[in-house]
Amino acid sequence: MGFKNICKQGSQLYLNGIFPERILARKLKNCAKSYPRTALTIEVLVSSVLGALKVILIPCASTYAALTLPLRALFNAIKTKSCQHLASYAMAWLLNILTIAVIIGLVFSLVFIPPPVVFISLGLLMSVTTSVTLFQVHKNLFPPYEPPPSRPHTPPPFADEYVPLISESYFD
């Protein structure tokens, strides 16, 4: 497996750990096709609530994923009898460890910042996490539009007959 595939699968595992609503959105694609307005309404409500809670949920989800990803990788290797996906799980685990380290660094740096700046930054962080949650749910609920395959162009039934142009018939 190439490095590009390892990075792609690792990032997908990481994002599925941080945004578990992505998995639910992928499973409900067919319902969203049938009822798009209802799906959009539910999507906005869910992303508003979960996005505001992501300030607390992202550290919890990262810690949970950092603890369970090695076990999931082990179970996947036993189930498939192959170590092919271990690098992807290691990549996702490293991303979770990096996320935890950044969060710990931010918490310690917030101690030295004045309280008004902390509250403004928390408000901005909550709005960003709400937007990212909405984007992740929407991207997995409504996949990009793929036009149907085009049919080969068939000529009109009487293609060999001469059809005069408008300008030619005007001068007759």
Curated annotation (Swiss-Prot):
InterPro entries: DUF5422. It is a multi-pass membrane protein. GO terms for cellular component: plasma membrane. Keywords: Cell membrane, Membrane, Transmembrane, Transmembrane helix. The chain crosses the membrane at residues 44-68, 86-110, 117-135. The keyword Membrane applies. It comes from the Bacteria. It is found in: Cell membrane. The keyword Cell membrane applies. Belongs to the chlamydial CPn_0442/CT_006/TC_0274 family. This is Uncharacterized protein CPn_0442/CP_0311/CPj0442/CpB0458. It comes from Chlamydia pneumoniae.
